């Protein structure tokens, strides 16, 4: 059984990005991994989870966690990020937004 914990630590940001592919899942995942490697080296990056729709193999969601909004914005406005964003735009359409976690739960938490 899981238990709810309190709000997320102050300042953390969650970036949610949905993708609809115009290419194969394999090609998309390769491009995504290159982008993720770049972001993993940026200050404030905490982690990500890329998930694929169970029934629609061309539909993905990326959920990335950042220490704060400023770190996220600094990373995605770097000139070195541009080729990564362009590569993903060339093979998919996407929609994205920044969120702040309000509640979470994990197994065994009290």
For each predicted feature, which ranges?
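Short, conserved catalytic or adaptor-binding loops enriched in Gly and charged residues
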Residues: 87-91
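Short S/T/G/P-rich N-terminal loop/turn motif that feeds into the first structured element of a domain
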Residues: 1-60, 67-79, 92-110
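A common structural junction motif
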Residues: 82-84
């Amino acid at each position: 059984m899981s238990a709810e914990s309190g709000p997320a630590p102050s300042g953390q940001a969650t970036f949610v990005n949905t993708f609809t592919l115009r290419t194969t899942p394999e090609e998309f995942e390769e491009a995504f991994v290159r982008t993720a490697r770049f972001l993993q080296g940026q200050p404030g990056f905490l982690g990500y989870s890329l998930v694929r729709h169970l029934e629609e193999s061309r539909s993905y969601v990326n959920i990335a966690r950042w220490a704060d909004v400023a770190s996220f914005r600094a990373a995605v406005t770097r000139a070195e990020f541009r080729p990564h964003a362009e590569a993903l735009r060339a093979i998919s359409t996407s929609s994205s937004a920044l969120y702040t976690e309000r509640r979470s739960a994990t197994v065994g938490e009290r």
